[in-house]
Amino acid sequence: MRGCACRGTAGVAHVSCLTEQAKILVAEAKENNSDDNQGHRWYLCGLCKQDYHGDVRCALGWAVWKTYVGLPEDNRYRCCALAQLGTGLGAMGRNEEKLSILEACWDIEKRRARAGAQVDLLAIQGKIANCYGELGRHPDALRVRREILAMRRKIYAPEDLPVLHDVTNLGVSLNHLRMYTESQPLWRKYIPVARRVLGRDHNLTTTMIKGLAAAISQHGDAPRDGLLEAIKMLSENSQRLRQVLGDTHPETQQNECSLKFLRGRLACLETKDT
């Protein structure tokens, strides 16, 4: 089973091996009282540092849940495992089930009411907003994402990863609702920040670029210029995604689909002008 997005034959692993590795690393971090609890091992490839997706993400969601389900309901590891199960189900398109699980996580976290719980609540709230978007409930997703970003800015600096992540999600919601006059300046403001802080190959950077390309190709008084700019951005994005994720990764294929669509629109526009 292909366990990550690594190139060539690298990354092929059994889910049972990935599960055992995650268990060991999380247990070691807990024993050593490490600030990094290694929880990301359940959803992030240790080699290429990209998120698992599809069948693998779903299988690991069930694996992490089975690992920690016996802990008390308010135990942090159990709460995180429940959220990972929801994300895994979402990876297979089971978004109604995912939403129910995330809402249960939200209720548990609120009841815990411990120090620092705000960050965990925002993380779950973000997953709920993502699920709203996947279910086509874009106004609900936008409302929640505005709330999240407002709270996050009170906790983090503008260039911190959580803020950049929330900005990306907000921009996606604005694009879905065709609110390009708001999303376009947001993308243009934060893409240089993401490039400087995260690098050009980071998934948030490439997602922001796709978001800006969508916004400028759909909005503006100069459709041809907008299409040319968007095509240039997606072409550069395509090269990076192929190098980092490979040709068959969903993100690469989605970028290619958008690029093909915009090239088709440009060809139609130029045909009309001749």
Label each region the model flagged:
Residues 8-11, 15-274:
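Intrinsic-disorder-linked linear interaction elements in eukaryotic regulatory proteins
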Residues 5:
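N-terminal C2H2 zinc-finger "knuckle"
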